[in-house]
Amino acid sequence: EVTKPETINYRTLKPEMDGLFCERIFGPAKDWECHCGKYKRVRYKGIVCERCGVEVTESKVRRHRMGYIKLAAPVTHVWYLKGIPSYMSIILDMPLRDVEQIVYFNAYVVLDPGNAQNLSYKQLLTEDQWLEIEEQIYGEDSELLGIEVGIGAEAVKRLLEEVDKTSEAEKLRSEIANCKGQKRAKLIKRLRVIDNFVATGSR
């Protein structure tokens, strides 16, 4: 995990530890040399320095090793939203246009319809519609309970968390066995994506 905004130390010209170029995370800046210089040369290949925690290997590993930054709020990754096919809309079983409306703060989404008869799960609402419902919820003689509505990446995160991938995959398999044509192809595409998530243990 990258925890510091620093890149390179201006005096030593070496990458800062836990920074954006950290050698412990991404690998050594120089071939076969750890950060503190205790291990140098190929003969120490594969050793992790006990002082600085850097693995003695080739510097080219820095090109493909990945780190991560813990964000303060959820953010929607454009690859999963805009990629073809859009994995986000496939998993949520929603049209891409609807998912974009939520992500770009153009529409609210119903996360829990509560006891409201005119609302359904994943239904999109305009700002005016939501304000109208809010007035009804907080009205004096209101009987509306348990209604939850969200917007932005936080709402999308909640919807994704609520997808039970294992049971969804089983449900899709039984549906695929009983349908044909374009609907079957669409279900197979969705099952493939969900199966990949289950196989890799991704959340």
From Swiss-Prot:
Residue numbers binding Zn(2+): 34, 36, 49, 52
Keywords for this protein: DNA-directed RNA polymerase, Metal-binding, Nucleotidyltransferase, Transcription, Transferase, Zinc
EC class (word): transferase
Cofactor names: Zn(2+)
Cofactor: how bound: Binds 1 Zn(2+) ion per subunit.
Transmembrane segments: none
Catalytic activity reported: RNA(n) + a ribonucleoside 5'-triphosphate = RNA(n+1) + diphosphate
Entry GO terms, CC: DNA-directed RNA polymerase complex
A Gene Ontology molecular function term of the record: metal ion binding
An individual GO BP term: DNA-templated transcription
Coiled coil stretches, renumbered: none
Keyword Transcription: yes
Record-linked Pfam families: RNA_pol_Rpb1_1
Record-listed E.C. numbers: 2.7.7.6
Family: Belongs to the RNA polymerase beta' chain family. RpoC1 subfamily.
Function: DNA-dependent RNA polymerase catalyzes the transcription of DNA into RNA using the four ribonucleoside triphosphates as substrates.
Subunit note: In cyanobacteria the RNAP catalytic core is composed of 2 alpha, 1 beta, 1 beta', 1 gamma and 1 omega subunit. When a sigma factor is associated with the core the holoenzyme is formed, which can initiate transcription.
Protein name stated in the entry: DNA-directed RNA polymerase subunit gamma
Upper lineage: Bacteria, Bacillati, Cyanobacteriota, Cyanophyceae, Synechococcales
